[in-house]
A protein has these predicted regions:
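Long, contiguous binding/interaction regions
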Residues: 3-155
Length: 155
C-alpha cells in the first residue's frame, strides 16, 4: 500500500438560525463513522459485476501467525477490483474517508471539525455538502505540509 501525504482539514459550520435541521444533520454526519460515505455513498462494488459480468471474490490475506492483515476483492482472472479507488478519487477527491479526527466541537449554532485526508482536501465532499446543505455556512481550510500547499476551498 502506498502511503499518502496527509492533508489537514479544518471545517467550520454555522447555522443562521433558520437552517437548524440541515445544520444538525450535517453535524451528525460529520461526527459519525465514515462521514464521507454517509454524505456521498460509494457504490457497493462487491455486488456490482464488472464489464464481463463477473463479480469480485473476497480474498483474506493472513500473516504467518494467522492474523488477518488485509482483505481484497479480485475477479476470476486475478485482477484486483480497484473500482472503489477510482470512484473515491473521482467523486470525493481523495482515496479514503476522513482519518484522525482531531477536533469535533459542536455548540449552539456553530461547529468545528478537524481531520486528515489523503493527498488533498476532499473537493467532491465539499461540493456535495454545499449542494445538499445549501443553507449551512461553511469555511474549509486545508494544509498539506508535505507538498507545501494550503488554502480555503471556495464558497
Amino acid at each position: 500500500i502506498i502511503m499518502p501525504n496527509w492533508c489537514e482539514n479544518r471545517v467550520r459550520l454555522s447555522d443562521n438560525g433558520e437552517t437548524s435541521e440541515q445544520f444538525d444533520r450535517l453535524c451528525e454526519l460529520l461526527d459519525g463513522d465514515n462521514p464521507f460515505n454517509a454524505i456521498f455513498p460509494m457504490p457497493d462494488f462487491p455486488k456490482i459485476p464488472n464489464d464481463k459480468g463477473e463479480l469480485p471474490v473476497k480474498e483474506v490475506h493472513k500473516n504467518d501467525k494467522g492474523e488477518v492483515v488485509a482483505e481484497t476483492y479480485n475477479f476470476p482472472d486475478g485482477k484486483n477490483d480497484d473500482r472503489w479507488y477510482h470512484w473515491c478519487v473521482d467523486n470525493w477527491g481523495t482515496k479514503w474517508d476522513m482519518c484522525d479526527k482531531f477536533t469535533a466541537e459542536i455548540d449552539e449554532g456553530w461547529a468545528e471539525f478537524g481531520f486528515n485526508t489523503a493527498w488533498s482536501p476532499p473537493y467532491g465532499i465539499f461540493d456535495k455538502i454545499k449542494e445538499d446543505f445549501p443553507d449551512v455556512g461553511i469555511s474549509w481550510f486545508y494544509d498539506e505540509p508535505g507538498m507545501e500547499f494550503a488554502g480555503y476551498l471556495p464558497n
